[in-house]
Amino acid sequence: MAQKFFQASGKLAVQCYKRELETAFKSRELAGFQILDLQDFTGQGTALVGILNAFMENKGLITADDWRSFCSDCVLMLSFPSFVYEEGMKFSYRILFSNMNPTELKDARIVVTMQNKVTGERMRNETERMHFTQTRLSEYADGTFRIPECGVPQVYEVHVEIEGSSIENSYEIYAFPKCHSKLGLSLIHISEPTRLQLIS
């Protein structure tokens, strides 16, 4: 049980790092950021709060390549309003790119896919070919996917990449069937403070 807890809390820490760092990359008001530490602290006790263990070894929470997808000199991101959707809704996104690398990417395009993690069903959007130069933050095309009808909850991976490069990123979104049941008023009970009795 302890191992499952450490794994689950560690995965949550990774997601928190990802959201926080991407927020910094998406801001035009920040010149940079500094992460205090990435490893577990074992000084006066034990604090298993790091992405790496006390010996700077991988704990199995995230691979180095996946970490670089949101913490690097080139970070490709999607901006979207929610991680949770009902079937039939539109998943709308905007492509953002923070490029601190002086190397220019020529004649490349951005590809965005949304894949069902159970069935493998996949949808794809792509931009026109373009040049990517060193810029603090650039905004590119908007796009939309429609969430398919589903009888049970589904998880989708939304993947974005610059074709022909190692620059990529991914997100998980969750889709649920529409809820048609309504809560009847007969099931609601209201208690007034004057009617409550103190049981001693």
Question: Residues of each region from the PLM?
Answer:
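Beta-strand-rich interaction surfaces with strong enrichment in secreted/lumenal proteins
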Residues: P81-F83, T127-T133, R146-I147
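Substrate-binding clefts and catalytic carboxylate motifs of secreted carbohydrate-active enzymes
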Residues: M1-D107
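Surface-exposed, short loops/turns at beta-strand junctions within beta-sandwich domains
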Residues: E149-P153
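Low-complexity, Pro/Ser/Thr- and charge-rich linker/hinge segments at domain boundaries
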Residues: S170-I188
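Beta-strand-rich binding/interaction modules
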Residues: K90-M130, Y140-G143, Q154-E163
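Single conserved hydrophobic/aromatic residue that forms the stacking wall/gate
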Residues: I188-I199
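Short, exposed coil/turn segments at beta-strand boundaries within extracellular/luminal domains
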Residues: G164-E168
